[in-house]
From Swiss-Prot:
Organism: Xanthomonas euvesicatoria pv. vesicatoria (strain 85-10) (Xanthomonas campestris pv. vesicatoria)
Name of the protein described by the UniProt record: 3-hydroxyacyl-[acyl-carrier-protein] dehydratase FabZ
Family: Belongs to the thioester dehydratase family. FabZ subfamily.
EC numbers on record: 4.2.1.59
Single GO molecular function: (3R)-hydroxyacyl-[acyl-carrier-protein] dehydratase activity
Chemical reaction(s) catalysed: a (3R)-hydroxyacyl-[ACP] = a (2E)-enoyl-[ACP] + H2O
Keywords on record: Cytoplasm, Lipid A biosynthesis, Lipid biosynthesis, Lipid metabolism, Lyase
Gene: fabZ
SUPFAM superfamilies, alphabetized: Thioesterase/thiol ester dehydrase-isomerase
Pfam family, one: FabA
Free-text function comment from the UniProt entry: Involved in unsaturated fatty acids biosynthesis. Catalyzes the dehydration of short chain beta-hydroxyacyl-ACPs and long chain saturated and unsaturated beta-hydroxyacyl-ACPs.
GO biological process: fatty acid biosynthetic process; lipid A biosynthetic process
Enzymatic class: lyase
Localization terms from the record: Cytoplasm
Length: 152
């Protein structure tokens, strides 16, 4: 069990103690807000032209793949789950098992700062359900309900 004390903002090196993901698949740069009582978390992803997915999505017109925005929301939910359970990245792996009501409203491009707001709806045993919105400049660019389950 982890006994770390985290002060906001939580930086990427601390996030790496909570999530098993690493470059190029760690999609959370900073935790800005966290309320474990209301199960609410806000995180940031700085979208850089140096992201490896921009090489092929799309050449000369880079757009962040929507599925990676959903993955980023799930990772933010994972941070909250680990903090809420007092665990670290190695305690138990969680996998995305379901996505519902995914919506993509606007393209995310290099230079954007993605702000992800995630609300945990429930956590029963090893299954967490979240609703998340990703925003750029205050405008919702993507949203989804995500379910993650711990590995057995």
């Amino acid at each position: 069990m982890s006994h770390h004390v985290y002060e906001l903002p939580i930086d990427v090196s601390q996030i790496q103690t909570l999530l098993p993901h690493r470059y190029p698949f760690l999609l959370v740069d900073r935790i800005l807000e966290l309320d474990l009582e209301t199960k609410w978390i806000v995180a940031q992803k700085n979208v850089s032209i140096n992201e490896p997915f921009f090489q092929g999505h799309f050449p000369n017109r880079p757009v962040m793949p929507g599925v990676l925005i959903i993955e980023a929301l799930a990772q933010v939910g994972g941070v909250m789950t680990q903090l809420g359970l007092g665990r670290d990245a190695l305690s138990q792996l969680f996998y995305m098992v379901k996505v519902d009501k995914a919506r993509f409203n606007k393209q995310v491009v290099p230079g954007d700062v993605l702000i992800m707001e995630v609300q945990m709806k429930r956590l029963i045993r090893n299954v967490g359900c979240f609703y998340g919105e990703a925003k750029v400049d205050g405008e919702v660019v993507a949203s989804a309900e995500v379910m993650c389950a711990g590995a057995r």
